[in-house]
Amino acid sequence: MREWLQGLPKHERRIIGIDVMTVQYRWPLGMPLVRNLGSALWEIRSALQNRIARTLFFVHEGEIVLLHGFIKKTRKTPTEDRALALQRKNAYLKTS
């Protein structure tokens, strides 16, 4: 997650950071900023200048845990991105 963010331009990181902070301090939220993906997974929908970023997360013991981020290219969340987020969620839960 951190590497993905660091690879983005500064102004895009700022937009995503503001959206993550909004979710952190105003949870629970719904559309248009946050959408439920099922399996206790959620996505933050960040509108960048000419593309859309998604940050997948879950809530554990009152904390928001960021799992995966990507630039969205289709209307539907790609299966491989969702699977990676679920894998990271399960790994996190095993160690906590």
PLM features: what roles do these ranges have?
Residues 2-52, 60-64, 71-96:
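Basic, Lys/Arg-enriched alpha-helical interface segments
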